[in-house]
């Protein structure tokens, strides 16, 4: 199997962590909101990806007849469960951070949007929640620019301090709507530069000079 992750887990400090829920936030970078013809929101807006969309392997298989887009994101791993978490203590609930791709069936998403329907089906196909190994939240590398390369060309870059709603605010807001569990993942939004991928592409995700993940698209 290309995923090799049928137990739906991620890795932090050589430990396997079982994933419970996968949440994602929309339009958390102003430039991305603009490129999508939209604006940022007054409050975070979340959607969910299916647990079966989780992918940690070095190869992904995409439907050849679909317009699949990459969306590079910093992914949060919840380590300590809680609800109604205060922003000032929210970081204490974070076990680690990773890079990920919120792969999106763009044509299907646009069709669902026009019908005012949820995006779930366009965001939850098998392999659409790509996640690297997690790093400790205290790792100073997270202050640096993160990036996505497609066939050795940088197509997306971002920094955590460019977010409209910082990670701690996302945790505060989401935990007030639904309890967060140990092993929950939060995709924290994508910077500008989203675009299509196709079979034969090679993708690299990294921060500063360090490569976090290499992926072959099949």
Where are the regions a protein language model picked out?
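Catalytic-core "active-site belt" of small-molecule-metabolizing enzymes
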Residues: 1-181, 185, 193-218
């Amino acid at each position: 199997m290309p995923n090799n992750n049928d137990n739906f887990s991620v890795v932090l400090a050589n430990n396997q962590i079982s994933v419970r829920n996968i949440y994602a936030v929309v339009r958390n970078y102003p430039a991305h909101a603009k490129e999508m013809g939209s604006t940022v929101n007054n409050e975070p807006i979340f959607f969910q990806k299916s647990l079966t969309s989780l992918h940690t392997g070095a190869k992904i298989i995409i439907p050849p007849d679909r317009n699949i887009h990459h969306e590079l994101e910093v992914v949060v791993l919840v380590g300590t469960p809680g609800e109604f978490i205060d922003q000032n203590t929210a970081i204490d609930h974070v076990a680690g951070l990773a890079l990920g791709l919120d792969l999106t069936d763009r044509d299907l998403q646009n069709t669902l949007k026009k019908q005012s329907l949820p995006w779930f089906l366009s965001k939850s196909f098998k392999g659409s929640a790509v996640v690297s190994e997690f790093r400790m939240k205290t790792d100073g590398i997270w202050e640096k620019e993160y990036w996505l390369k497609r066939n050795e060309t940088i197509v997306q870059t971002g920094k955590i301090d460019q977010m409209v709603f910082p990670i701690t605010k996302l945790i505060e807001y989401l935990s007030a709507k639904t309890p967060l569990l140990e092993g929950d993942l939060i995709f924290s939004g994508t910077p500008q530069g989203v675009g299509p991928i196709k079979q034969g592409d090679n993708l690299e995700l990294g921060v500063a000079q360090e490569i976090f993940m290499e992926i072959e698209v099949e």
